[in-house]
Swiss-Prot record:
PANTHER family: UPF0210 PROTEIN MJ1665, UPF0210 PROTEIN SPR0218. It comes from the Bacteria. Homodimer. Signal peptide: none annotated. Disulfide bonds: none annotated. Belongs to the UPF0210 family. This is UPF0210 protein BL1209. Pfam families: DUF711. InterPro entries: UPF0210.
Amino acid sequence: MLNIMEVHETNQMIEQEKLDVRTITMGISLLDCASDDVDKTCDNIYRKITTYAKDLVSTGKAIERDYGIPIVNKRITVTPISLVGASSCKTSEDFVKIAHALDKAAKEVGVDLIGGYSALVSKSMTPAEELLIRSLPQALSETDIVCSSVNVGSTKTGIDMNAVELLGHIIKDVAERTADNDSYGCVKFVAFCNVPDDNPFMAGGFHGVTEGDAVINVGVSGPGVVSRALDAAKGKDFEFLCETIKRTAFKITRVGQLVAQEASRRLGIPFGIIDLSLAPTPAVGDSVGEVLEKIGLEQVGAPGTTAALAMLNDQVKKGGIMASSYVGGLSGAFIPVSEDKNMIDAASSDCLTIEKLEAMTCVCSVGLDMIAIPGDTSASTISGLIADEAAIGMVNQKTTAVRVIPVAGKGVGEMANFGGLMGYAPIMPVNQTSCEAFVTRGGRIPAPIHSFKN
């Protein structure tokens, strides 16, 4: 039974502590849109998206109005396009046509982003998958809200180093093509290991082939709420601290569950999952970094940061999992540098380095996320960063990812501005010692011994 204090507490979370639902994401299967003609495939895709998602934005706004819960983004994910376009796309330009169809359909229904211009190549690349990857510079520079991801490895299959090596060059090319906008195209691309099928967050979201025809997935956000709750834990022991985070995560997730079920009911589309992730914004008081500092660090990046993040991540999961009937996606704590005020400050003061961020990715939701690096960073160095993160994910049986932005024409100490939720970031130094002989060997890194479970 709810009591009036709990109602007041929820209102306070929304009004003062920046609690919001980060995204309602509709996943749509496009497998039935495939044909042997690329123009027909584009027409099928446009028609299906605009039919299924026509009421998504208006429904999100209605739920916002009825419940007083801010819903920041409405998004769409689709089946990986390398699968949908495999029969009809004979060139990279054919895949770019599909990217334009996605962009047009997403704008027509009014969503903020559409994800799924993706390829799953954890073991090897088909010709169609390689064509899609090679189309990324043109596709991401010519479209506005299309997001892309490539899964380069998994615990079961190992790491496809051919794809990893290729992506270093692709990311550099995307950066050059969008140089006039601080290489913004790279913001819309992420390389994964162990990618989930039901991620509502961008840029890594797509509608997995194991999913049904359509689904509603919701991502919540609440680092500001956790931060405020931790004011009461100052000077207390770890038991009290963990209990505080856990209880707060439960309340945050319960709001997401309500929104997800209501959106599912109103749209007539099944509810999929709640992603428990604490997703920061560049606004003051909405920072995962601030939470870590309230746990007891002088600044993010100090010794103890990885342990504090591990504890935070675990308690968020323990609290959130009780609040939702289905939990999925990435679910934990995000550490995107450009989207988190306290992490921006820590990176600017050199307290937070890429090497420390890599250590933090061993215990949190994702990986090296929204990190601006010098524009003259070599393709092989970027491939090396992707390989390192993929190895962490592969060996530890967790999702890891890399979203780095080699900002064309800028160097260490300068600032890159991506705008809106994507924020801004100082250009961080990268170890430039060459790994080219390693990443260009060709082939794949085998799966680890503990992957053999049968």
